[in-house]
């Protein structure tokens, strides 16, 4: 079961002294025990620092590789939550370049999201090196294409399209 905690500064938490907080699973101890075990594991193995270190290595070296091939496909965001931003020569987003990179990376055993990618404690230094080697091979393939207008000819499927988007109507001001 999920676990929730209501926390905060003591000055704000005092408000709960006069409140009755009810929860469906108040006496359910298994999730609490599991949470404690996970927190202890995270502390013992310093997983947060490890994720930031591995993510920083991937983030920085990825950007060095694509820059060395003059391919505008940089990782942006944070080393633990990054997104590949692909731009054409005019500085516009290039879904074709992103699709081509993702296609070639999958062929080399690396699956990446079109959106954000998260780094986890299970990603080893070997995984990072494997990813960077796959990227280097992918960049060699892409840099051999003479003109970016030809990228779509190398895609082995349709150009991805948005399948769902949420349109929020403007709110009226009173």
Q: Language-model segments: which ranges?
A:
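Conserved N-terminal phosphate-binding loop of PLP-dependent enzymes in the Aspartate aminotransferase
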Residues: 1-174
